[in-house]
Amino acid sequence: MAQESDLSKTADKGKGKAVDDEKKHQDVDGKTPANGKKEEEQNASEELSEEDQQLKSELEMLVERLTESDATLYKPALEAMKNSIKTSTSSMTAVPKPLKFLRPHYETMTKLYDEWPAGDDKSSLADVLSVIGMTYSDEDRQDTLKYRLLSPTQDIGSWGHEYVRHLALEIGEVYAKRIANDEPTQELVDLALVLVPLFLKSNAEADAVDLMSELEIIEELPKFLDENTYSRVCLYMVSMVNLLTYPDNETFLRVAHSIYKKYNQHTQAMVLAIRLNDLGLIEKDFEAADEDPALRKQLAFLIARQGIPLEFERSNDDDEKIYECLSNQKLSEYFKSLGKELNILEPKTTEDIYKSHLESSRVAGMTNFDSARHNLAAGFVNAFVNAGFGSDKMMLVGKDKDSWVWKTKDEGMMSTVASLGTLLLWDVENGLDHVDKYTYLEEEQIQAGAYLAIGIMNTNVRTDSEPAMALLADPDKLAHKNPLIRVATIMGLGLAYAGSCKEELLSFLVNIISDPEESMQVSAMAALACGMIFVGSSNSEVSEAIVTTLLDEESGSRLNDKWSRFLALGLGLLYFGRQEQVDVILETLKAVEHPMAKPTAVLAEICAWAGTGAVLKIQELLHICNEHIEDGEEKKGEELLQAYAVLGIGLIAMGEDVGQEMVLRHFGHLMHYGEANIRRAVPLAMGLISPSNPQMKVYDTLSRYSHDNDNEVAINAIFAMGLLGAGTNNARLAQLLRQLASYYHRDQESLFMVRIAQGLLHMGKGTLSVSPFHTDRQVLSNVATAGLLAVLVAMIDAKQFITSKSHYLLYWIVTAMHPRMLVTLDEDLKPLTVNVRVGQAVDVVGQAGRPKTITGWQTQSTPVLLGYGERAELEDDQYISLSSTLEGLVILRKNPDWEGEK
């Protein structure tokens, strides 16, 4: 009981009692609440210190003066009041004393305001009322703003930062109300534009951006910035983009782009132009740097990394060099210089990867027996492990008779010969000599493999001679009687020109898509190749051809083919990253009656929203996964529909860290309660969420799924483990995969997949990455994501494609393979060795001062490898980097102001 009585006493001391007293006074003598409060305050006056008591009396006297009839006293009284409020120094957490003492008189003063005639005194009173209004936090009373609008003073900043923030908050609330009621908002906008410079002055750029964003006037921002504030404002704006909806996200990027251009930050502007996927803007930015050849080369590297086909007039040697940068021709050379520096040029054998001696001795012999299937797996492992180095011990050997091709059979020969393409990746000039001899052999599978190899080695690289066009865009090969050669040629073209939007290829490929006589396998491959070449361009000719095929009554039976999913994927890729623009196609697909229509629509939608982290889309996809499928003729289509929805959840969430965390939890639920078709897709989606980023929580879960009772779930989990660790040499994953090799030593298909995963894990001897995000994880590469998606769509039914005869589909992943290196060059593109610090990137958005952008760093000399989430910065100021992010190929310029060690 004692406790309760104590509690009531403390409650009495505080607010509760004031309210009670107010009622009492009103009842007894009908006084106004303000007077009631005054008496209450007097009762409590014993608690005030002498100074406070004096201040309180002074302020009360000033209020009295305002109520008197002598108008000459008003001005000095108001000035004294303002002075008192402005000079009060109280702690930031408490309400300033003058406001505390004036609050009881607030109602009195508002009445006075209503009674006074218009004039300076009235404005001055409104000024004071606006400040006292801060002490009321009712939702419906925006008094601070109300009186601020009535008082035309310009000197808002003198009331302090807290007041300005409070005002901004109320502007936002009132603006939303006025928009809802269709009332004019111009005065609010004008006031907001007065507050923005005040925010920027006190380093609260986040508040400035938020206020302008809320009032939809973000385009006005650039005129308020200067050299000191623009970088922080842009950093905040760009990091907000992922959380905004269309079209605000695009507006923000465009405004930030214009700010960077204004302050000559060309590389940062270019990164945003690339994110906007606006070719006109990219060309304009590129042309703007024509005075500075070194800068143009740096911009060319950025454009080339994204695989954007940019044409420009070449008139001199400098232009030729810039074109080399723009078309990635030197990529192979720089990659090999990295290999030399890291001392890994020596080719690795499959045994170096399998490490059979570490597998349990009982089954060690059995996982390594010599069969065509095992040799095919070895071919893939060799292809991935030595990718890009141009040397190995199985394919590029002295005598043709020793070549590994002869140890495989049928389609296996095609995939093995195609592995030459990955070994010689990006090295077109030398590569063609090695592959050429295989095109003359009589075995058609080997010819097919050679054509595919030509396509693979040209991926992400362009040359003037266009060997892929010359060798593959050949009617004889595209109409060859053997469908394998047709498929290989089409796939080769799709890889070689991925993302290039090359119009000349339409005449070769579009007819194949819509030809009703053609087998579904070839048509679908042509659709996928077109999707790759025109990724994200919403090319109408290709989309019409694919939709016509879907609408065609006669091709109904063809659409039941397992290959028809690639027809759908081809359509989806055309709208990659297009967001709202995909709705046109979704409407068209509603007219298609075939069960393939729904899965196609979902594929198109997930491609359009890839990497955006759009929460509403993820919710829609989760709803699709919840539906129960009835048995019937539409069952296959519905099952694919749910599998694509699961992949889509991963694809959309991959761009944003918080979304990833949440989605990984959803995947756990889907694995518990989902049907078999959903469970098969979950491991693939988990791999897609963090490719080349082996997070322990993800691979531990996948390791559990890799022993699942459903063999297809296990196979997909094994592949996902490979994808998760692709190119990282992660020791824990390597150990898990070796254990799986022993566990599945009797199961040929699972063992084949374990080998593929081991090859992926050690890709490029640990120097490559398949993560589609680059340039400090800001930009999502369309081409890379499209390649990953093609492999994963095939993996949904692994036993019909990858582990049976269509294993060559794995080579679509080549579009995503890229060195995770930092190579520094001088202005003549010669490698330059400098010291850099490499550490974990730290998010510094909105932090005060100039915080460190990396943590836990080590100093290394370039060229260096960068892991996922790592960032590099130059150790000293001897050189200035022309690129805003140290990643990939970076040009350094000597700093003219550097003193150095003289």
Swiss-Prot record:
The molecular function terms of the Gene Ontology recorded here are: enzyme regulator activity; protein-macromolecule adaptor activity
> Where is the secretion signal located?
none
InterPro entries per the UniProt record, alphabetical: 26S_Psome_Rpn1, ARM-like, ARM-type_fold, Proteasome/cyclosome_rpt, RPN1_C, RPN1_N
Q: Where is the composition biased (Basic and acidic residues)?
A: 1-41
Q: Which UniProt keywords apply?
A: Proteasome, Repeat
For region Disordered, the annotated ranges are: 1-54
**Keyword flag Repeat:** yes
Q: Mention any one GO cellular component term assigned to this protein in its UniProt record.
A: nucleus
Concerning Pfam families, the annotation shows: PC_rep, RPN1_C, RPN1_RPN2_N
Q: Compositionally biased, Acidic residues: which spans?
A: 42-52
- What are the recorded Gene Ontology BP terms? proteasome-mediated ubiquitin-dependent protein catabolic process; regulation of protein catabolic process
**What ranges cover the PC repeats?**
415-448, 449-487, 488-522, 525-559, 568-601, 645-680, 681-715, 716-750
Q: Which family does the UniProt entry place this protein in?
A: Belongs to the proteasome subunit S2 family.
What does this protein do, in the record's words? Acts as a regulatory subunit of the 26 proteasome which is involved in the ATP-dependent degradation of ubiquitinated proteins.
Q: From the Swiss-Prot or TrEMBL record, give the protein name.
A: 26S proteasome regulatory subunit rpn-1
Q: Which organism is it from?
A: Neurospora crassa (strain ATCC 24698 / 74-OR23-1A / CBS 708.71 / DSM 1257 / FGSC 987)
